[in-house]
Amino acid sequence: MATVQEKIELLHEKLAKVKAGGGEKRVEKQHAQGKMTARERLAKLFDDNSFVELDQFVKHRCVNFGQEKKELPGEGVVTGYGTIDGRLVYAFAQDFTVEGGSLGEMHAAKIVKVQRLAMKMGAPIVGINDSGGARIQEAVDALAGYGKIFFENTNASGVIPQISVIMGPCAGGAVYSPALTDFIYMVKNTSQMFITGPAVIKSVTGEEVTAEDLGGAMAHNSVSGVAHFAAENEDDCIAQIRYLLGFLPSNNMEDAPLVDTGDDPTREDESLNSLLPDNSNMPYDMKDVIAATVDNGEYYEVQPFYATNIITCFARFDGQSVGIIANQPKVMAGCLDINASDKSSRFIRFCDAFNIPIVNFVDVPGFLPGTNQEWGGIIRHGAKMLYAYSEATVPKITVITRKAYGGSYLAMCSQDLGADQVYAWPTSEIAVMGPAGAANIIFKKDEDKDAKTAKYVEEFATPYKAAERGFVDVVIEPKQTRPAVINALAMLASKRENRAPKKHGNIPL
């Protein structure tokens, strides 16, 4: 009979075997590719010595194709919980050194367990994906595992923040778990996501494409819009995840952490008074407006490489987290198009789900014209913005800096779509269409058309007609934007808005 000490030594041996993953050679190969192991990634993600691993000794039950002879340490996935900046977070990290991180029945069961724990505790979950896909030997059991993970992703949506991290291959059905989460991080040159890989595409369509061009970090950050962030390397990626979590609440019943940023809430920035060109058709950088108004000029852009005609980012005003949606006049004059509508709508809905106030900076001349846009469904996609803003019950503040024309003005959270406070700069032009274009229609047959057009532009290319009708709450100097927004946020802190009871709405997807 073994002694107590021998039993303790046996535990240490078993733990060492699990922590060794797929063995020294496979770990070396992982490092040679510029990738950390699953446990190294989790150690970087969590506060020092805070990570608690669960289910180290779980084993697969497959007896087909010689699998019964295989020992797969930890079932190829590390799961557990710890703290990030002192706050509880759950995580899983697939271990590519063990059977390529392939997903089988018990691998999936470990992931589902931490998903459910995260829901019970009201804590965010981070999933690090690095897997060759389904464990083929386990057949339908592996497929069922994916289905259970997808179900938990959907169940947790809007309740706890879910962050997916792609740090290697993520192919086939595996891609849908990240797609169901709130944010996806990818690492340049080492991350790939695709449903069918280059070899299958070549055999079916004849197209030749590399894995990086097909599903690499920049393909999904700038072309498809599937991913939200692209990191230079794994260290950078993990640092960004920790930074993002600082802007978010732990769950939908809490508020985001209030941070003492040290920036004066009454600060005015004189540079804003001279930022806009005198010619309203000339571009400027809306990021300069954001940087001049938020705490310490610091903001974290979401999808910075996708649909760059609109900016979505997290920032703080007087220490309070906000989500910012802003037109970018430097790109396509700030017009809304299909991709910009999708990008902003999803961001609006995330902010609303997690009690994060929304601040809008508006300079929008209209929806982008063109057959590609019309045939691509700009009506349906643009309607998503109208729906998302109308549905949102968090504080909504709109700052109109210049153009606000037609349906695009409404789509950028006008008072009619539920904006709680609308501020306008003196440079604002709020109208059904551009004043010059409107005048050309109204005075088309008049002999003194030019004089009447000039007078019309002078009278209507201002915020004052809208203010006279109550569509603008306050006309402010540009430099007053920061204190105005902070005052509005303080006033709206106790906002409560009730809607008609329903199972759920039918957003125009």
Curated annotation (Swiss-Prot):
GO terms for molecular function: propionyl-CoA carboxylase activity. One of its GO terms (cellular component) is plasma membrane. The keyword rRNA-binding does not apply. GO terms for biological process: sodium ion transport. It is found in: Cell membrane. Pfam families: Carboxyl_trans (PF01039). Its EC number is 7.2.4.3. It is an enzyme of class 7 (translocase). Residues 267-503 form the CoA carboxyltransferase C-terminal domain. Completely inhibited by avidin. This is Methylmalonyl-CoA decarboxylase subunit alpha. The gene is mmdA. Carboxyltransferase subunit of the sodium ion pump methylmalonyl-CoA decarboxylase, which converts the chemical energy of a decarboxylation reaction into an electrochemical gradient of Na(+) ions across the cytoplasmic membrane, thereby creating a sodium ion motive force that is used for ATP synthesis. The alpha subunit catalyzes the Na(+)-independent carboxyltransfer from methylmalonyl-CoA to the prosthetic biotin group located on the gamma subunit. Can also convert malonyl-CoA into acetyl-CoA. Disulfide bonds: none annotated. The lineage of its organism: Bacteria, Bacillati, Bacillota, Negativicutes, Veillonellales. Signal peptide: none annotated. Belongs to the AccD/PCCB family. The methylmalonyl-CoA decarboxylase is composed of five subunits: the carboxyltransferase alpha subunit (MmdA), the tunnel beta subunit (MmdB), the biotin-containing gamma subunit (MmdC), and the delta (MmdD) and epsilon (MmdE) subunits. Interacts with the gamma subunit. Gene3D superfamilies: 2-enoyl-CoA Hydratase, Chain A, domain 1 (3.90.226.10). It comes from the Bacteria. It catalyses: (S)-methylmalonyl-CoA + Na(+)(in) + H(+)(out) = propanoyl-CoA + Na(+)(out) + CO2.
